[in-house]
From Swiss-Prot:
One of its GO terms (biological process) is CTP biosynthetic process. Residues 1-79 form a transit peptide. Gene3D superfamilies: Nucleoside diphosphate kinase-like domain (3.30.70.141). Its cofactor is Mg(2+). It comes from Nicotiana tabacum. This is Nucleoside diphosphate kinase 2, chloroplastic. PROSITE patterns: NDPK, NDPK_LIKE. Its EC number is 2.7.4.6. NCBIfam families: PRK00668.1. Belongs to the NDK family. It comes from the Eukaryota. It is found in: Plastid, Chloroplast.
């Protein structure tokens, strides 16, 4: 008999069932049959007991904390942030022609890095090919060499704590359209083939490129007066 309906875990008895003694008697056994499965599977209810909700939230919170704390920094970046490094920065021909030299230099100065080498230089083809030798197999290599040798470049050597990784962040992504606002490429460039500036991608390459672009006597070792306010 249709004397009982269930909403959630609570039985609802119709008014017609209450008015009939016979209905009430025949309904009792079916109540046990319907209620027992709900009681057994109470964890399927829409509203779980608070204790279970809090327990699951706490476990998720602890798990997220564990995941967060183990992925803050990459090991090689942590190490580089504690060491004084050298990096090679080059303002490419488009940056020179557009009058961006002062703007780009000021960004590194304001960051607190030390300029140890600076010159305006017309790059010969052989030097450009040596500098970009890792890209020789790329189809755009000839065009890249023509671009770098098309006009004067500004060669710079910079020194500072974690300067390689930090300079890469200041410069921004290779494709200026993907570079963050506030970065040099994000603010001053629009195309990969005219992305204004080059920066070393590792401490080892920083040393190699400085040695490649600067000759003996072209680097200056000095101590800025503000250095105690920049480095502990």
């Amino acid at each position: 008999m249709g004397c009982l309906s269930v909403v959630g875990a609570s039985p609802c008895v119709s008014s017609s069932a209450l008015s009939s003694p016979t209905s009430r008697l025949s309904c009792a056994p079916s109540c046990k049959l319907i209620l027992n499965p709900i009681k057994k599977n109470h964890h399927l209810a829409a509203f779980q007991p608070a204790v279970h909700l809090f327990a699951s939230n706490q476990s998720r919170s602890h798990a997220s904390k564990r995941n967060h704390t183990t992925r803050i920094f990459l090991p090689h970046l942590v190490a580089s942030m504690e060491e004084v490094e050298e990096t090679y920065i080059m303002i490419k021909p488009d940056g020179v022609q557009r009058g961006l030299v002062g703007e780009i230099i000021s960004r590194f100065e304001k960051k607190g890095f030390k300029l140890t080498g600076l010159k305006l230089f017309h790059c010969p083809k052989e030097l450009a090919e040596e500098h970009y030798k890792d890209l020789q197999s790329k189809p755009f290599f000839p065009k890249l060499i023509d671009y770098i040798t098309s006009g004067p470049v500004v060669c710079m050597a910079w020194e500072g704590v974690g300067v390689v990784a930090s300079a890469r962040k200041l410069i921004g992504a290779t494709n200026p359209l993907n570079a963050e606002p506030g970065t040099i490429r994000g603010d001053l460039a629009v195309q990969t083939g005219r992305n204004v500036v080059h920066g070393s991608d590792s401490p080892d390459n920083g040393k190699r490129e400085i040695a490649l672009w600067f000759g003996e006597g072209e680097l200056c070792s000095w101590t800025p007066v503000q250095e105690p306010w920049l480095i502990e």
